[in-house]
Amino acid sequence: MSFAAHTKKELTMMEGADCCSKAELSALIRMNGSLQFGAGRLVLDVTTENAAIARRIYTLIKRLFQIHAELLVRKKMRLKKNNVYIVRIPNKANEILQDLGIMDQSLSFIPGIAPEIVKKSCCRAAYLRGAFLAGGSVNHPEASSYHLEIFTSYQDFCEALTKIANRYKLNAKCIERKKGYVLYIKEGEKITEFLSLIGAHQALLYFEDVRIVKDMRNSVNRLHNCEIANINKTVNAATRQMENIQLIDQEMGLENLPKRLREVAELRVAHPDINLKELGEMVPSGVVSKSGINHRLRKINEIADKIREKQNISM
């Protein structure tokens, strides 16, 4: 079972006040519901591929409206042959839709999200929970990038959902995607805040544990890469210094260098692997600071560069 599926399973076992259950059910039906006319009346179907979510919808309808809905199971024939679960409400569908803020008394759909359904903070969180159950997904925290999204077919609904999410500073964005619109959250910290908000506390703890280990591992890798880069830089610099000292020795002799440069050149030849600090501590005439050694080696490099320039001119 995927991390997203585990998260949804946890959410379907939550208990809540009637106002919050109504908000959650409103989001579930708003996103996964469809209407049809049968036998002269309005029939509401709520469709999902998740058995736990189907049971959740069935239970909420029964509890809130004292209606026994029908639970149908269909087999998908294309691609993944998963079961499709349909919670069918053959009676009082229009009354339920009006009470949930999805349709008005003239049976016209209410755009976006009805304000009376999400008046309270707890109900806003429950509405986001229902939306996530209906059309949400979240990457496993071990994935290369953090990503949580909720898909909907309607732009106005996506924007309204994003507005609610951002009341909690979740940095949610709404973008158009093929066949619909997506609310998404990219930051690991904001995803944990979203999971906490909708009540997925077990998923949150697991996500945080994995995220902490992952971030520590990434930090260690960055530090290791930085150390390797520094070592390579030091080795390359030492190699260049050795080449320059050998060139000076061949062309003019190290004995003709000023004493302070000759000392450092001879030490570098004798100890090609030590760092500048260690080199400075070995200078015969007295300890020289790291910056002092670096300055003298730059002077040696400049002398070698001038020799090369003369060689190029003579050629």
From Swiss-Prot:
Coiled coil: none annotated. Residues 275-309 bind DNA. It comes from Brevibacillus brevis (strain 47 / JCM 6285 / NBRC 100599). Belongs to the WhiA family. The keyword Glycoprotein does not apply. It comes from the Bacteria. InterPro entries: Homing_endonucl, Sporu_reg_WhiA_N_dom, Sporulation_regulator_WhiA, Sporulation_regulator_WhiA_C, WhiA_LAGLIDADG_dom. One of its GO terms (molecular function) is DNA binding. One of its GO terms (biological process) is regulation of sporulation. Keywords: Cell cycle, Cell division, DNA-binding. This is Probable cell division protein WhiA. Involved in cell division and chromosome segregation. Gene3D superfamilies: Homing endonucleases. PANTHER family: CELL DIVISION PROTEIN WHIA-RELATED.
